Design a protein with these regions (language model features):
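Rhodanese-like catalytic fold shared by cysteine-dependent sulfurtransferases
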Residues: 1-34, 41-74, 80-120
């Protein structure tokens, strides 16, 4: 029997740390973590998230270890709606990253909270 994408994401989230954008941005101020946007570059053109590091979901496993070399460094993942970020976070944990959080809201909300934090 097949599993739907919604079920796959829900099952993955059960084992992941998930936060809303406001909580994640406040926590980032304390942890010095890195926000990773797993959307494709074309998506960034129409809806940028300027304080995020873009590593598209399709190449995440191939690139992340060159960029984030500390397995315990706080990582906060987001995408357009939270689905790809959830699946990406699951993969990062499989790679050995121990401090991975999914921001589970639309990218527009993430951007709004990034802008709010930057203006403080």
């Amino acid at each position: 029997m097949f599993v739907t994408l919604a079920e796959l994401i829900a099952n993955a989230r059960a084992d992941l740390r998930c936060l809303d954008a406001e909580t994640a941005m406040n926590e980032l101020q304390e942890t010095g973590g890195t926000i990773i946007d797993v959307r494709e570059p074309l998506e960034l053109e129409t809806s940028p998230a300027p304080q995020s590091l873009n590593i598209p979901r399709g190449i995440l496993e191939m690139k992340v270890m060159d960029i984030v070399t500390d397995a315990d460094h706080p990582l906060y993942l987001h995408c357009a709606t939270g689905g790809r970020a959830t699946l990406a976070a699951e993969q990062l944990q499989r790679l050995g990253y121990t401090n991975v959080t999914v921001i589970t809201c639309p990218v527009e909300v993430v951007r709004r909270h990034q802008e709010s934090q930057a203006s403080k």
